[in-house]
């Protein structure tokens, strides 16, 4: 506070605006954010004790801060790194059945955060300490007051993902580092993207040909809703020879049916359109009423993505398989 009072008010205001506008809303189930003022919150953080105390100093202007997670309406997990301490906060909140807001504070969101958070906010702002000092006592990321304003709606996140995010480290390692848009893509798609880049230096590479966790330019807004539509479910097929006898002659034809082998993994594909604003959903594959696989999909507004799911059905026979809102009958053979 003393430092802020000594600085030019216009610079402070501009910097705080930048902090808010560079924040990215990744997930917001049931419009949990912004939080309602006056609720009871528990905050856990992997930041320094000084930073955590700074948060606890400003949060009472917006909510009641409780020291026992069991007493909270909402748990806030401020993650400056993804370590055992961060996972402990998250797992404790889930075990307690609490609504959970995860703040990815100057770190990339990952699949674990997305899967466990009810709401996920990424804070990307960072600056050197005044005069370049490395002395303790300086918060060089998003200020506590802006942190609280973002959570409770006095400021709104307006940022977007500037580089697509991988689903896991193995996917990120497999990415061609000089190629955009290829997280999770197969080699054929990578060659297509490379050819497009070489055709024109200014060519815009598609951001939905791969299988990233989060697409380039993704960023949700408070109150804005996605509108997901499922289209064109593709399942494995088998071709069978059909021999027909008629009037003493034999004819051969072929029929293709949705079929695969028991216990052998197969891939289901579906197009997922988003006719609304940027948003996220969990696509479920359901066999005979039982969920057999799930996949998190974030889709930019007005865009589409191909959902690719590896499935296995062990029991031979005919089964009803649904992916999202689309359903087909699939035959499983020995």
How would you label these PLM feature ranges?
Residues 1-317, 324-334:
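Preference for extracellular/luminal or secreted protein segments
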């Amino acid at each position: 506070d003393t430092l802020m009072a000594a600085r030019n008010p216009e610079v402070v205001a501009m910097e705080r605006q930048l902090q808010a506008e560079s924040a990215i809303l990744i997930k917001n189930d049931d419009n949990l954010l912004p939080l309602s003022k006056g609720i009871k919150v528990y905050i856990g953080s992997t930041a320094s004790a000084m930073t955590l105390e700074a948060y606890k100093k400003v949060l009472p202007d917006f909510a009641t801060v409780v020291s026992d997670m069991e007493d909270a309406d909402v748990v806030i997990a401020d993650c400056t790194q993804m370590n055992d301490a961060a996972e402990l906060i998250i797992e404790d909140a889930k075990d307690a059945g609490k609504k959970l807001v995860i703040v990815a504070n100057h770190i990339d969101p990952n699949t674990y955060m997305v899967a466990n958070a009810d709401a996920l906010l990424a804070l990307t702002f960072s600056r050197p300490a005044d005069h370049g000092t490395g002395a303790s006592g300086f918060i060089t990321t998003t200020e506590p007051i802006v942190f609280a304003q973002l959570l409770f709606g006095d400021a709104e996140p307006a940022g977007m993902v500037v580089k697509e995010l991988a689903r896991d480290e193995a996917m990120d390692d497999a990415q061609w580092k000089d190629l955009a848009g290829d997280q999770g893509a197969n080699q054929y798609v990578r060659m297509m993207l490379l050819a497009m880049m070489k055709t024109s230096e200014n060519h815009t590479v598609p951001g939905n040909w791969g299988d990233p966790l989060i697409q380039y330019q993704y960023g949700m807004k408070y109150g804005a809703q996605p509108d997901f539509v499922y289209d064109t479910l593709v399942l494995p097929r088998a071709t069978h020879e059909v021999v027909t006898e008629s009037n003493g002659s034999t004819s051969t034809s072929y029929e293709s049916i949705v079929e695969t082998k028991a216990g052998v993994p197969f891939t289901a594909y579906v197009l997922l359109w988003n006719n609304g604003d940027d948003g996220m959903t969990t696509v479920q594959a359901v066999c005979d009423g039982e969920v057999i696989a799930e996949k998190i999909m974030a889709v930019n507004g007005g865009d589409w993505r191909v959902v690719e799911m590896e499935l296995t059905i062990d029991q031979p026979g005919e089964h009803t398989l649904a992916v999202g809102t689309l359903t087909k009958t699939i035959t499983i053979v020995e």
